[in-house]
Amino acid sequence: MASRKTKKKEGGGLRAQRASSNVFSNFEQTQIQEFKEAFTLMDQNRDGFIDKEDLKDTYASLGKTNIKDDELDAMLKEASGPINFTMFLNMFGAKLTGTDAEETILNAFKMLDPEGKGSINKDYIKRLLMSQADKMTAEEVDQMFQFATIDAAGNLDYKALSYVLTHGEEKEE
């Protein structure tokens, strides 16, 4: 048994392991877990890879059903191969290099705002936060909303909220 492992390592397996493990050293363990949850949510057919159908299903679950095939193809072409979890981490590592936390939060909100209005219905956000990935409690969401600007129609200004979440105070106009 040990000789098989040794042969595998001598055959280049170790080099591949080193290359793939570098991406894991770029993130904290909690971040890797969050990426794993995001990957699992996107891997709709649970085959360990994100493909075009997974992307379509993910967009549909976010209410965006008019995404074009060429847009999906362009997203998939950003990867240098099939998008397994390691490739997913590599892609996000490259995208997040040089971005700050506020920009990252804003980009997440923008995914839920296909019209680019700068606001999202607070009830919709509350449902998502309580049902997806690291599920928040109603109390946690309500506590976050205390720092949010919400208009009379119930729309949350996510740009202002992103600023408060990352800087701890409202931006002075």
Curated annotation (Swiss-Prot):
Pfam families: EF-hand_7. Ca(2+) binds at D43, N45, D47, D54. Jaw-closing muscles. Residues 1-22 are annotated as: Disordered. Residues 30-65, 100-135, 136-171 form the EF-hand domain. GO terms for cellular component: cytoplasm; myosin complex. The keyword Repeat applies. Transmembrane segments: none annotated. InterPro entries: EF-hand-dom_pair, EF_Hand_1_Ca_BS, EF_hand_dom, Myosin_RLC. This chain binds calcium. Myosin is a hexamer of 2 heavy chains and 4 light chains. This is Myosin light chain 5. It comes from Felis catus (Cat). The lineage of its organism: Eukaryota, Metazoa, Chordata, Craniata, Vertebrata. The gene is MYL5.
